[in-house]
UniProtKB/Swiss-Prot annotation:
InterPro entries in the record: CAT-like_dom_sf, Condensatn
Native organism: Mycobacterium tuberculosis (strain ATCC 25618 / H37Rv)
Gene name of the record: papA1
Molecular function in Gene Ontology: acyltransferase activity, transferring groups other than amino-acyl groups
Keyword Metal-binding part of the UniProt annotation: no
Effect of residue 175 to A: Loss of sulfolipid-1 (SL-1) production
Protein name: 2'-acyl-2-O-sulfo-trehalose (hydroxy)phthioceranyltransferase PapA1
Gene Ontology BP, a term: cell wall organization
Amino acid sequence: MRIGPVELSAVKDWDPAPGVLVSWHPTPASCAKALAAPVSAVPPSYVQARQIRSFSEQAARGLDHSRLLIASVEVFGHCDLRAMTYVINAHLRRHDTYRSWFELRDTDHIVRHSIADPADIEFVPTTHGEMTSADLRQHIVATPDSLHWDCFSFGVIQRADSFTFYASIDHLHADGQFVGVGLMEFQSMYTALIMGEPPIGLSEAGSYVDFCVRQHEYTSALTVDSPEVRAWIDFAEINNGTFPEFPLPLGDPSVRCGGDLLSMMLMDEQQTQRFESACMAANARFIGGMLACIAIAIHELTGADTYFGITPKDIRTPADLMTQGWFTGQIPVTVPVAGLSFNEIARIAQTSFDTGADLAKVPFERVVELSPSLRRPQPLFSLVNFFDAQVGPLSAVTKLFEGLNVGTYSDGRVTYPLSTMVGRFDETAASVLFPDNPVARESVTAYLRAIRSVCMRIANGGTAERVGNVVALSPGRRNNIERMTWRSCRAGDFIDICNLKVANVTVDREA
């Protein structure tokens, strides 16, 4: 799937041309300093703790776990290894997330070890010689796992007149922001040095450790009666006490398999434009319309009259804009569909997304701590990501990368969530990361085809068509949905679930 100049795919589908590999890893002295680093009082962020627990739980079952964010960019010329060594070390010392590693003492006790002096981090280049595409991929995904300090590595693949720069970083220390801000940081520092200029002055990097402190201060003040916590509890209780599962079969989770990514074009440029016009006419944005299409598609595949989804949100503050780390929260989305038109469903979906945005600051694991009858998210919970390159901040990133060949890749291991990624540039496409087995592949193929079918119907004018009421809600389930949806609405919004009507839903189109 391509979003403007950025290619998103599985690493097995990445075919870098053969070349001489030079990779950067820590010196023995740096590794020794890291291992000797004292325990810090700062806990991991909630999303870091989830990653460490899920990695360890999957490993205990003999299963592999997706963990790496891999990004690459093509560069003309020969790499200046001395300059690149400076840039890599400057990056690692600039961002304090790289000074930490984590020790899992038990499921509920994860401790952070912190390197006190950034100068103790030193990466040096190693030349490996000519490698094939397959050998290159194997080397890159062999970056140490989440329980090692050095769970990040960098490298270049040198060819006759160009090279590929790559970063392979455990998600503990990076999110999708790295593909934009992180790569541009490398590019700007490297360009200045090879042009004979002194190292450039970068804006303040901020501190991911400070974010972890702020997050735990905020969550410690929450109680079971906090409105945000109550909203999460309402959502979870209707989904068996946790995050919603993907509604189609995914095969036997106890059988070891890799992960794969399946992509499908949903709409061409003209259809995408018509679809967005339909969303605007429904008083929704593109994301609300896509959530509506996913909800309708799931209804057509399973008969489910209400869609429950989770979508991630970057929770950086303006001060965190340049900060390297994992700043992802989740928004719960509830979208009833039975008996409604697309216009009504899209408005409800948009309202659910907008009013739930503040819940992204409340990690679900904290909600479980406050309400122990709930359960932490299980493997392969359903997650939907949206990447809209027509609006900020992604639109600015795509302009910066014009003319460059940039890629980001899944590492070929099984993801913890089953992740659907919808990307729009001129066209609209979707990709799904899933367990690589025949049952899951069949389900994901049917799922993508159903979403495409719904999107095309809407783009071709089918907004007034009402969704058939395939499955009736039980009275108790209906009351839970009504209670949860009312709780999530802003003042001035009105969703009459009993009569399945929508009125007075205002949308900020610039949000």
